[in-house]
Every structure is written in C-alpha cells, then in structure tokens.
A protein has these predicted regions:
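Nuclease-adjacent, charged terminal/linker segments that flank catalytic cores
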Residues: 1-70, 77, 265-272
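Charged, often glycine-rich, active-site loop that binds/positions anionic groups
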Residues: 73-76, 82, 123-133
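A short, highly charged nucleic-acid-interacting micro-segment common to nuclease
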Residues: 78-100, 120-122
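Conserved catalytic cores of phosphodiester-cleaving nucleases, focusing on short active-site segments
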Residues: 103, 131-133, 148-154
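A short acidic/basic microdomain associated with nuclease active sites
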Residues: 106-124
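Short, solvent-exposed loop/turn segments that connect beta-strands within catalytic domains
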Residues: 137-145
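Acidic, metal/cofactor-coordinating or nucleic-acid-engaging core segments within structured domains
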Residues: 158-228
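Charged, structured surface patches that assemble and position nucleic-acid processing machinery
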Residues: 201-272
Length: 272
C-alpha cells in the first residue's frame, strides 16, 4: 500500500488555554518538519502522490500523452506552482491531506482518500465537505459508530493573519446539509476503484435513522509561524454553529509552510 504515517511524528501538541470568544477550547499543534530527513520525506511524498494518482495506475494514465511519469504529474495532475490559483490550491490540498493524516493516524478515524484523483481542473478545489472520517466499531452497526465532518482553511503567506478558523467554522455550518452528497461521492469513488468493501462501510452512514451513529464536526486552521496571530484565534466565535457542542477546533502552525508544500510536490514528482 502507498500510505505512510511517519510524517505525523512531527506533530507536537502545545499545552495552552487557548479558547474561542465563546469559550470553546482550541487544540494547538506545532508541525516541526525536517527537510533534512530524506527517508521520511520520500515516504511522505509517495503517500502524498498517491492521493492524486495511484502508482499502480500512472503508467496506464500517461499512456498516449508522450509524457514521463514526472511530467504527467506536473503537467496534468498536480496543481501548478505559480500560475493563477495553483499555489493556493496546492496549499489547500496539502492542508486537507495533513489534517486527514492527523485525523486518521493520531485520532484513530478511517479517512477515505478519494478527493483529489478525479479532479477535472487541477487548479480548482474539490467541492463538498473537506474531510470525512469514520469510526466503525463492529459488524452489528451499533450506535457507537462515529462520523466526523471537517473543514480546513490555511494561510501560509501575507503580512497579517486572516480569520481562517472563523472561515472554517462558518463553512462547517453547511456540512450537515452537504453530508448526503459527500458520502455518496466517497462511496461512488471507492466503488469505481473496485474497493467494494470500503464502499459498503460508507453505506453504513447514509441512513442515520435506520442505522444510528454519532455525528461530530471539526474545523482546522493552518498558518506559517511568521503570520500566526493568537488574537485572531481567540476572536473566533462558534455560537452560531448548530452543532456547537460536537465541534472540535484545531490550529496547526509551522515554519515556512509553503516551502514545505512546494518541496513535497517536487519530491513526489521526482520520485514517481
């Protein structure tokens, strides 16, 4: 399998009393990556690349294009580095994948990886809920099952921090309405990939009346350290969220995050 979790060892939780304006606790994490650790970066790049195109499929998909594996990824699959909205899409995709890895490998949810491989336009973000994670407890479809919908926002450049956590909170308000479409999209993509067993796991969550489970919500904001501003975080407000009591807030910050984003795309292409 292409998936790898060693890069999640670079997460460090910062003990803090950080709270939103309405008293909601905020989990603060530092992401202390190491660009000199070639082994971890290589494994991570493979993990990252396979979100866009499985290594087992790349030769078939590039057939007829006249492109090498690297050029196929750079010219047709990966968001562009500098053109138009490409850089912003790169940072958004990276941030969603990083939070998905935290959700799966640190918090113990199953997060299907279906969001990026079927993009029609590579410099656009995929519509729908950013992330959905699942906890399935047994074959009897017990009410212990959990579905967690996550919205992710990032800012890695600029002179002043924007209210990205508030933006994620506001987007999360719509997630319950988008749930049915998002679940159907995940299930269909898994089925199209021949992953019928995983598609059936998603089906367990498509009718909450007949198969009860717990719904949870999460929001994440990611910043580079040079623009991170605690005042922007503590001024966010979750009181308008209809599922406020089931809302998890997380902030991830690290040094020069956009440098890491571009480096990861570079390694993913070079080692394809």
């Amino acid at each position: 399998m292409p998936w790898n979790s060693e890069h999640t060892n670079w997460f460090f939780k910062i003990e803090t009393n950080l709270k939103s304006k309405d008293g909601k606790e905020v989990c603060l994490l530092e992401y202390n990556y190491d660009l000199n650790d070639k082994t971890v970066l290589s494994k991570w790049a493979k993990h990252f690349r396979n979100h866009y195109c499985f290594d087992s499929e790349i030769d078939f998909l590039r057939n007829g294009t006249g492109l090498s594996r690297k050029d196929f990824l750079v010219q047709l699959k990966f968001p562009t580095e500098a053109r138009g909205f490409g850089s912003g899409i790169r940072s958004g995709d990276f941030s969603e994948i990083l939070v998905a890895d935290y959700l799966e490998y640190i918090l113990g949810y199953w997060v299907p990886r279906t969001r990026y491989g079927n993009k029609t336009i590579r410099d656009e973000s995929t519509k729908g809920t950013d992330l959905i994670g699942f906890k399935l407890y047994d074959e009897n479809k017990t009410t212990k099952d959990v579905l967690k919908m996550f919205e992710v926002k990032a800012q890695y450049s600029g002179n002043k921090a924007k209210p990205r956590l508030q933006d994620a909170i506001d987007d999360s308000i719509k997630d319950d309405l988008r749930k049915a479409e998002s679940l159907n999209a995940i299930k269909q993509r898994l089925f199209d990939k021949g992953k019928t067993e995983e598609a059936l796991k998603v089906a367990r969550f498509q009718n909450q009346v007949d198969m009860p489970y717990t719904s949870e919500f999460g929001v994440a904001a990611l910043y580079s350290n040079d623009i991170y501003d605690e005042d922007v975080i503590i001024n966010c407000d979750t009181s308008a969220h209809p599922y406020n009591s089931a809302l998890f807030l997380i902030v991830i910050k690290g040094d020069d995050m956009m440098k890491l984003v571009h480096k990861l795309f570079e390694i993913a292409a070079d080692e394809s």
